Amino acid sequence: MKNINIYIHTWKINNWREILNEQLTYIDDSGLGEIASIHICNGDTEKKTWFEMWKHSFDNDSYYLYLQNLGISWQGTKYEDLTTNWRKWVMGGVVENWKEYISHLDEYDAVGDCWKDVSYYRDWHRNKRKYKDSDLTYPQHFATQMWWTKSSHLSKLENPFEHQKYSVPEHGGERVIMEGWLTSQGENFKELRNDLSKEPAEAYINQHLKNIPK
């Protein structure tokens, strides 16, 4: 089996230590802690952590697990429980069941949960009037934004800081385009689980309620 590298994106706001400790416990309980190299990366944007993974992939033949402290900006809000449950559901797959995920990496470039195809904003956005004639798209991605991949795929991707150039003002921020960074090259991706009923959609449409310290 290839070496395993786990990159944990940790935005150090609110009670970040609680989530980090939770995720490290998942890793240890799964047995991954005994065999994987763990990289804890701090930053206010995921592309900083992705950049470190991307650089690492050029000189290492490895499997990579990407984790993030999902829900950190919802702590102390009415959506804290909703986003916490979502994070734990995701961890229950990619970490607790890690052996199944990596078993598919010989055949696939990336493995994750809750796959979403490319979609037109006009087909789902609440502001129908604004986007009714628009060709703006949301890229294909794993909605969980925690996934497994391998160095042979990562090294083919564009520098994540360069990839953000594809963002346009109509996206409302670069996060939309960045969610598709992992899947921006190739078509060989594997979804293992899909339960979008667990996705905290209500929180996502109320971004103004996030708890982000000034």
Regions found by a protein language model. Give the residues of each.
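ER/Golgi luminal nucleotide-sugar-dependent glycosyltransferases, focusing on the catalytic module
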Residues: 1-214
